[in-house]
Amino acid sequence: MGEPAGVAGTMESPFSPGLFHRLDEDWDSALFAELGYFTDTDELQLEAANETYENNFDNLDFDLDLMPWESDIWDINNQICTVKDIKAEPQPLSPASSSYSVSSPRSVDSYSSTQHVPEELDLSSSSQMSPLSLYGENSNSLSSAEPLKEDKPVTGPRNKTENGLTPKKKIQVNSKPSIQPKPLLLPAAPKTQTNSSVPAKTIIIQTVPTLMPLAKQQPIISLQPAPTKGQTVLLSQPTVVQLQAPGVLPSAQPVLAVAGGVTQLPNHVVNVVPAPSANSPVNGKLSVTKPVLQSTMRNVGSDIAVLRRQQRMIKNRESACQSRKKKKEYMLGLEARLKAALSENEQLKKENGTLKRQLDEVVSENQRLKVPSPKRRVVCVMIVLAFIILNYGPMSMLEQDSRRMNPSVSPANQRRHLLGFSAKEAQDTSDGIIQKNSYRYDHSVSNDKALMVLTEEPLLYIPPPPCQPLINTTESLRLNHELRGWVHRHEVERTKSRRMTNNQQKTRILQGALEQGSNSQLMAVQYTETTSSISRNSGSELQVYYASPRSYQDFFEAIRRRGDTFYVVSFRRDHLLLPATTHNKTTRPKMSIVLPAININENVINGQDYEVMMQIDCQVMDTRILHIKSSSVPPYLRDQQRNQTNTFFGSPPAATEATHVVSTIPESLQ
């Protein structure tokens, strides 16, 4: 066998501008050009010499649409020839056929939408030359126009062959613009089709990027018509052609080698019709079409390069557009993020400024409120000292002032003594007091605890705290009852003095008083208001004075009368005052008042031998000097006060002393 020389080439795009020109060319030339493009002529000649079997191509119908190509011989202007109807009449194939293995190359470019056309087609025969044998690449001379013209009457639809055989079928090459992106692939394992419903054995050839040799076990290949649509080629054989992996051809049997090309094959269908006889003179005509195939491969290669360049440009543009689009989207996203970050930054700056201002205000306020601890301690110490001075200071200061004010007090005034009522002593004492003190009692405190009389209020007077000892309620009620009874008995005495002539009425009143106050030594006597006044010439020692309430209103205001206090008012100056011999600084001074009272029962106590007196024990809450206007004093008490003052400070009258009068204000007027 000679060295196989595969013609590597690809078909141009179905959208080539010369695709639809020269549609009326000879179908024989187009068929041979196509076969020369796919096969190696040396292999075909060697196989045809050894071919011993006769093949029957009557039922061969290779219905496949192929891509158009350019022919320099048929058209000087390099126009593309497209053949619509091509008839091939090969010799009849041998009936004894075996399984073949046909492998088709797969698509190389994933982005291309057309199928790759195999670059090499090897057909070999063991016994005799096949009618479809082609020349090899070594014959570079171009065939003349006469053999080309002779092919037309032999294989044309209007002429007969030399043996009188007529073609039965036509091979139609139709260019279709539709592109199938995904080829169908068969597995490499052999498959035997035994279904009785299929009239003939079939194989499917698809494109692969490399050469896929066939395991040649039969000398002749029988092709059957394939479906009009799709990317598969169906070959009719007694057995199914098996797909095998690429490798070395094992035998010298006729081989159909399909080399993977670059150009993609569209959905074209080629119908190969076998000839009824094996004596068809095809060998001479096949040699004529060889230069046409060689000349067209160069143009196809250049077109493929241009097509690849255009595809690369399109891909580059598409990738550039996508990159620009992605970059634009990325930039837009960055701008949006930048705007959001700037706005958030501004907001955080504002919040930070607000917080700083608030912090400054709080710090300044703390600085203002902070006071050093030494100042606080000094203030506390000063407050404590002030309380101590106010509590203990004034008493000692007053005592020292009183001693300084009275340095020339006579020893007689510094001793404990009792006031007498003798005319001479009273006059001497009163004259001395008037001359020294200008008829006023000075504020003095004796060393031997004599009676203290306040003539004026001190500059800093602090009232003592109120004394609230534990007082029994029953005892309080008893004391109140005794005081009220003492006042009422004076009123009863006044009533008796009005009715001196009526002794019987006096006896009834005393008996009634004894019945009401039998449990008490002093009895409270109920009284009734009387509008009549008591005569001044009455001989009774006690006289209850009744007057209009209006005459006492000014007097009550002058003495600051309170409703919860008993008042004993005396305008006489001949009272017997007994000072306290001891003094307790922790308690209030106590005072006992002894005043005339009415005897409860004259049978028990003899009125001639005993004086009935009321003793009132109390604690001194407060002492002060009052200046009462003379006009506010009742008229009767005013005259009585004038008389008693003259008697107290002057010589005793020649006549008998005036009777003592104790005036009692009724409870109703109080």
From Swiss-Prot:
PANTHER family registered for this protein in UniProt: ATF6, ISOFORM C (PTHR46164), CYCLIC AMP-DEPENDENT TRANSCRIPTION FACTOR ATF-6 ALPHA (PTHR46164:SF1)
Residues covered by region (Disordered): 91-183
Effect the entry attributes to changing L419V: Reduces proteolytic cleavage
Entry's free-text remark on domains: The basic domain functions as a nuclear localization signal.
Basic motif: annotated span: 308-339
Topology in membrane: Single-pass type II membrane protein
Quaternary assembly: Interacts with XBP1 isoform 2; the interaction occurs in a ER stress-dependent manner. Interacts with LACC1.
Positions bearing carbohydrate: N472, N584, N643
Record topology, Lumenal segments: 399-670
Documented effect of changing P394L: Loss of proteolytic cleavage
Xref: Gene3D superfamilies: 1.20.5.170
Name of the protein in question: Cyclic AMP-dependent transcription factor ATF-6 alpha
Post-translational modification comment from the UniProt entry: During unfolded protein response, a fragment of approximately 50 kDa containing the cytoplasmic transcription factor domain is released by proteolysis. The cleavage seems to be performed sequentially by site-1 (MBTPS1, S1P) and site-2 (MBTPS2, S2P) proteases. N-glycosylated; in its luminal domain. The glycosylation status may serve as a sensor for ER homeostasis, resulting in ATF6 activation to trigger the unfolded protein response (UPR).
Taxonomic path: Eukaryota, Metazoa, Chordata, Craniata, Vertebrata
Alphabetic keyword roster: Activator, Disease variant, DNA-binding, Endoplasmic reticulum, Glycoprotein, Golgi apparatus, Isopeptide bond, Membrane, Nucleus, Signal-anchor, Transcription, Transcription regulation, Transmembrane, Transmembrane helix, Ubl conjugation, Unfolded protein response
Subcellular location field: Endoplasmic reticulum membrane; Golgi apparatus membrane
Cross-link (Glycyl lysine isopeptide (Lys-Gly) (interchain with G-Cter in ubiquitin)): K152
Molecular function, one GO term: transcription cis-regulatory region binding
Disease implicated: Achromatopsia 7: A form of achromatopsia, an ocular stationary disorder due to the absence of functioning cone photoreceptors in the retina. It is characterized by total colorblindness, low visual acuity, photophobia and nystagmus.
Disulfide bonds: none
Site (Cleavage) location in chain: L419, G420
Residue numbers spanned by region Leucine-zipper: 348-355
Listed Low complexity bias regions: 94-113, 123-134
Site of covalent link Glycyl lysine isopeptide (Lys-Gly) (interchain with G-Cter in SUMO2): K87
InterPro entries: ATF_bZIP_TF (IPR051882), bZIP (IPR004827), bZIP_sf (IPR046347)
Source organism: Homo sapiens (Human)
GO BP annotations listed: ATF6-mediated unfolded protein response; endoplasmic reticulum unfolded protein response; ERAD pathway; eye development; positive regulation of apoptotic process; positive regulation of ATF6-mediated unfolded protein response; positive regulation of autophagy; positive regulation of transcription by RNA polymerase II
Tissues expressing this chain: Ubiquitous.
